[in-house]
Swiss-Prot record:
Pfam families cross-referenced by the UniProt entry: CbiA, GATase_3
GATase cobBQ-type domain sequence ranges: 251-446
Gene Ontology molecular function: any one: catalytic activity
Function field: Catalyzes amidations at positions B, D, E, and G on adenosylcobyrinic A,C-diamide. NH(2) groups are provided by glutamine, and one molecule of ATP is hydrogenolyzed for each amidation.
GO biological process entries: cobalamin biosynthetic process
Record keyword Iron present: no
Protein name (database record): Cobyric acid synthase
SUPFAM superfamilies: Class I glutamine amidotransferase-like (SSF52317), P-loop containing nucleoside triphosphate hydrolases (SSF52540)
Organism of origin: Clostridium botulinum (strain Eklund 17B / Type B)
Length: 501
């Protein structure tokens, strides 16, 4: 079979392109096509580390999982991670440069060939590629340097499906306006439209769809309902990241500090799915209250977020709660914040050369330009205070950080990797702990023991033995649900005809 492809472009950002690409990927995979996703450029702080230590955007990880594939950085050759006044540029999984935002156009011209090369390598492995654009596809001020939208479609000769979001309003104008801003050749590449996030009865919308088709002379291939799919989000601007109070008094209260540059918030997806666990994201002292555990997550700008914590008085409140017995846990940047001091003599994060930490752990962190990105197998080597059954539990996760932390005398190892290297410590009493390991709660035995210890401390009912096994199956069930709803509401046969399969 000849290599085939199709590309989903959007009328704007956040119209649902990533989700619809994942949906089509699972539909085609279920029909036994060798399909893979591709997005030239992603802008996100929520990244993933592949088995070979390459960094890529989460959206393509989700799409790879929908294809039942191991994620590969070829699927997302360029990842931009904004941080303060500059952006870290990841190319083919490795740090390429740090640039000011006004240099994007110049950067894109340099990377155009790399993007095409990555696509070609991926295309040689699979019979069908489903591409995703970035943001809106008709940004005329960016058109000359575009490498992620219509220019990408043209370079690989991909037919285009235009995606629009009706929930934000003005869907007809956004579709017509987008097409109007495309050139004649670009517009001829658009073979269909999908209207996403529809609420209400479709029969009341049919007349509008017919009128739209008469105006644009392009078929509307489907109207996707506004439906909740519990799959990982690319960006932190999501309904999941909120301070949601539990209605169940018998639930464990997990307060995650919502940092301004919070990254890898997918670390906590499993926790949010466990019955009897309430996960809240807190950004002010008003809402911190008295949780069972406080977690300081990862961040793209540790020092700046630490300063914001201090200015907001959240830092003082975290220390106060710790002193009164609340367990505090830090992950990656949050781990660094728990230490005595953070040193940035090379200006990796910005212009602040050093900043005092919260002082809860006897560690000192020094930032350097070399970025550590690797998947890790590890083991918990110490229990924590009132968390007595996590020692010797196995962990699988990943590291992604610039800082190196020197361990002092007043802490003990909490987590070691398979080579015996310390990648997390706790204080002698076990009342505060931190680690560089992302994804620790994805390890079922550890999470089961951790949550049950908290439940036991509160005299709550413990988790069922198969509770977390159900969670493991849950993700695949969500992909199947997505594929089913896509197939029921979108003309998949027409899409296959457009692709040529």
């Amino acid at each position: 079979m000849n290599k085939k492809n199709i590309m989903f472009l959007g009328t704007a950002s956040s119209v649902g392109k990533s989700t619809l690409v994942a949906a089509l990927c699972r539909v085609l995979k279920n029909e036994e096509f060798k399909v893979a996703p591709f997005k030239a450029m992603n802008i996100s702080l929520n990244s993933y580390v592949t088995k070979d230590g390459a960094e890529m955007g989460r959206a393509q990880v989700v799409q790879a999982e929908a294809c039942k594939l191991e994620p590969n950085a070829l699927m997302n050759p360029i990842l931009l991670k904004p941080s303060g006044g500059h952006t870290q540029v990841i190319v083919n999984g490795k740090v390429y440069d740090n640039i000011e935002p006004y240099k994007y156009k110049e950067l894109n011209k340099k990377l155009k060939g790399i993007v095409k090369e990555s696509y070609d390598k991926l295309s040689n492995k699979y019979e069908l590629i489903v591409l995703e654009g970035s943001g809106g596809c008709a940004e005329i001020n960016l058109k000359d340097s575009d490498i992620a939208n219509m220019n990408m479609a043209e370079s690989v000769d991909a037919p285009v499906i235009l995606v629009a979001d009706i929930d934000r309003g003005g869907v007809f104008a956004s579709i017509v306006g987008t097409l109007e801003l495309l050139s004649k050749n670009e517009r001829s590449r658009v073979k269909g439209v999908i209207i996403n996030k529809f609420r209400g009865e479709k029969q009341h919308f049919e007349a509008g769809v017919k009128q739209l088709e008469e105006i644009i002379k392009i078929p509307v291939l489907g109207v996707m309902p506004y439906e909740y799919f519990d799959i990982e989000d690319e960006d932190a601007v999501t309904e999941k990241i909120c301070n949601k109070e539990s209605e169940d008094e018998n639930s464990i209260d997990v307060a995650i500090i919502r940092l301004s540059h919070m990254s890898n918030f997918t670390d906590f997806n499993v926790l949010s799915r466990i019955n009897g666990v309430n996960v809240r994201y807190v950004e002010s002292t008003k809402y911190l209250k008295n949780p069972d555990v406080i977690i300081i997550p990862g961040t793209k700008n540790t020092i700046e977020d630490l300063r914001i914590l201090k200015e907001s008085k959240l830092a003082d409140e975290i220390i106060k709660l710790h002193d009164s017995g609340t367990l505090v846990l830090g992950i990656c940047g949050g781990y660094q914040m728990l230490g005595k001091i953070l040193l940035d003599q090379q200006g990796v994060e910005g212009n602040t050369l050093q900043e005092e930490g919260l002082g809860l752990l006897d560690i000192k962190t020094r930032f350097n330009e070399r970025k550590i990105t690797k998947q890790v197998e590890a083991q918990v080597v110490s229990n924590l205070k009132d968390i007595n059954e996590i020692e010797n539990k196995s962990l699988v996760g990943y590291e992604i950080h610039n800082g190196i932390s020197k361990v002092g005398k007043n802490v003990k190892p909490f987590i070691k990797d398979s080579k015996g290297k310390i990648i997390g410590v706790c204080d002698i009493e076990g009342s505060v702990a931190g680690t560089y390991l992302h994804g620790i709660f994805d390890s079922e035995e550890f999470t089961n023991a951790f949550i049950n210890a908290l439940k036991k401390n509160n005299n709550f009912d413990l988790l069922e033995d198969d509770e977390l096994n159900k969670i493991s199956d849950y993700k695949n069930e969500q992909y199947e649900k997505l594929a089913k709803i896509f197939s029921e509401n979108v003309d998949v046969d027409k899409i296959k005809e457009i692709i040529g399969i």
